[in-house]
């Protein structure tokens, strides 16, 4: 099929990661995946949740939100509604799980890392972009903490990134745009570490059930995309 942006079925959208995007956070990134743009910031508190007190273990938690102008129709802020909508809750928990999977909290001490992800323009794949960008911001933040003598070493076990895959008009596609996502028969988000371990797979048949063989094909394509994203992360961090 011919995609709107002329990509092949197996191509990512253009990815740009701008580090140190904001002045005040420990780490900050603007990640752009096609027309999707997400600001990811990292802050730290010198305390942990009650269940971790006295353990010398750290913690990480995440928040996710979409600015009113991030979508074609104005999106009402959760603070105005007085409640976080279910989708945002699901996504911020996913972001937290994804990043906790690659952190050695015994090396962080009793500190809490806060990840804040704010979508400033949504064109599909906001949760996967948030995970991919937040990891880079987290790496920068932990590197600064090490440089400042707050921690002895960067407690990252390995890199992690995320991407969407799906079936649109019977064809398997990587990194769906909003237009493709709306038309998808199957929509899937995959989070994976650099060593090829899955952190999360979210897959739904929106219109047509999918086969085991199609599942394997989608996971293989997602892995290819994630390995490319990890390469982009490393280049952004100056590690390649």
From Swiss-Prot:
Tell me which domain of life the UniProt entry assigns to the organism this sequence originates from: Bacteria
Reaction(s) catalysed by this chain, per the record, are: tRNA(n+1) + phosphate = tRNA(n) + a ribonucleoside 5'-diphosphate
* Example of a GO biological process term: rRNA catabolic process
- Enumerate the residues binding phosphate: 87, 125-127
Task: State the EC number(s).
Answer: 2.7.7.56
A single Gene Ontology molecular function, please? tRNA binding
Q: List, alphabetically, the Gene3D superfamilies matched.
A: GHMP Kinase, N-terminal domain (3.30.230.70)
- Disulphide bonds in the chain: none
Q: What is the top EC class of this enzyme, as a single word?
A: transferase
> Which keywords belong to this entry?
Nucleotidyltransferase, RNA-binding, rRNA processing, Transferase, tRNA processing, tRNA-binding
**InterPro entries in the record:** ExoRNase_PH_dom1, ExoRNase_PH_dom2, ExoRNase_PH_dom2_sf, PNPase/RNase_PH_dom_sf, Ribosomal_Su5_D2-typ_SF, RNase_PH, RNase_PH_bac-type
Q: Which Pfam families match?
A: RNase_PH (PF01138), RNase_PH_C (PF03725)
| PANTHER family, per database record | EXOSOME COMPLEX COMPONENT, EXOSOME COMPLEX COMPONENT RRP41
Q: Which family does it belong to?
A: Belongs to the RNase PH family.
Q: What function does the entry list?
A: Phosphorolytic 3'-5' exoribonuclease that plays an important role in tRNA 3'-end maturation. Removes nucleotide residues following the 3'-CCA terminus of tRNAs; can also add nucleotides to the ends of RNA molecules by using nucleoside diphosphates as substrates, but this may not be physiologically important. Probably plays a role in initiation of 16S rRNA degradation (leading to ribosome degradation) during starvation.
UniProt subunit comment: Homohexameric ring arranged as a trimer of dimers.
Record's NCBIfam families? RNasePH (TIGR01966)
What protein is this chain from?
A: Ribonuclease PH
């Amino acid at each position: 099929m011919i995609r709107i942006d002329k990509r092949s079925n197996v191509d990512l959208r253009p990815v740009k990661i701008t580090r140190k995007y904001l002045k005040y956070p420990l780490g900050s990134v603007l990640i752009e995946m096609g027309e999707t743009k997400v600001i990811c910031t990292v802050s730290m508190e010198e305390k942990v949740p009650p269940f971790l007190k006295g353990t010398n273990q750290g913690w990480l938690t995440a928040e996710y939100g979409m600015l009113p102008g991030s979508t074609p129709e104005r999106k009402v802020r959760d603070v105005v509604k007085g409640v976080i909508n279910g989708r945002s809750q699901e996504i911020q928990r996913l972001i937290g799980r994804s990043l906790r999977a690659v952190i050695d909290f015994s090396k962080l001490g009793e500190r809490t890392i806060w990840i804040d992800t704010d979508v400033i323009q949504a064109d599909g794949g906001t949760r996967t972009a948030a995970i991919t960008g937040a990891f880079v911001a987290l790496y920068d933040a932990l590197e600064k903490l090490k440089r400042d003598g707050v921690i002895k070493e960067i407690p990252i076990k390995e890199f992690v990134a995320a991407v969407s895959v799906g079936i649109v008009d019977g064809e398997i596609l990587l990194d769906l745009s909003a237009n493709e996502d709306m038309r998808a028969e199957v929509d899937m988000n995959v989070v994976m570490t650099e060593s090829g371990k899955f952190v999360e797979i979210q897959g739904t048949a929106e219109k047509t059930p999918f086969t085991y063989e199609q599942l394997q094909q989608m996971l293989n394509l997602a892995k290819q995309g994630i390995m490319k994203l990890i390469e982009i992360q490393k280049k952004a961090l100056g590690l390649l």
